[in-house]
Amino acid sequence: MSKGFKYFIKSKSFNFAKDLNNKKQNISSISWNNKQVFYRTSTSDMTLIYEILLQPKYKSEYFFPIEVNPKVIFDIGGNIGITAIYLSALFPEAKIYSFEPMSENFEILKKNIQYYENIQAFNIGLGSKNGNFKIYLSNDLENYGGTSFYPDPTGNKLESYVECEVKNINDIIKKLNLDSIDLIKIDTEGAEYDILTSLEEKFLHKTSWVSGELHGNRDFELLNYLEGLGFSISLNKEIDNRLFMFNAGKKAIISKLSRKTIKSL
């Protein structure tokens, strides 16, 4: 089955499938939950929509158990806001904070969250330090999610970069006057270890669920760190792929999950 046909079947939109081959990278949109979702044609934006919004719950790229029932969510690496609006649909009573340092992504993120009052977005990255840092751009001009804080993440040196603002994650939490983060989604192209290990442990002790993608930078050190804080870990990794998804849940939440849910992790 061709990629275009898969996109058509899931989206029920001929225009969405056709946009896979629209190399002009125009801003287009698709209806989801009776709201418009904006994206750049023929880019990784469309992959995000397909893998997160258009898949059944247990096959979506990220899995967030309803049993978590979060009040506060951090979407770290917000990209164009696809995960944020997915989280808003799952947890309409939660307050969602989305952080995206790339201005080009952020402009589309703002358009996508305009219909969701429980999402607040920030055009910054999170990390252990405050400052402006280089973010290297993918050599694949259609991949707007393949940025990296590291110039040589895969053995193919990245030449192009932009400078983006990064804020210390603990400073941001204090500024927002938060005393807990119930759920964290993180996909920061290799900065996951730096971000989560710099987060004050008192917050992670109160966090019920962390879900994200890891990129080959101290990944298993991070998972071991989370395990030491009381998280149980599940991961889905292919032996020849440095990228993989993971879920980390506190035992109190996992004990509430059904057998079907646990098998899907």
Describe every region a protein language model picked out.
Residues 1-265:
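Phosphate/nucleotide-binding beta-alpha loop and adjacent structural elements of enzyme active sites
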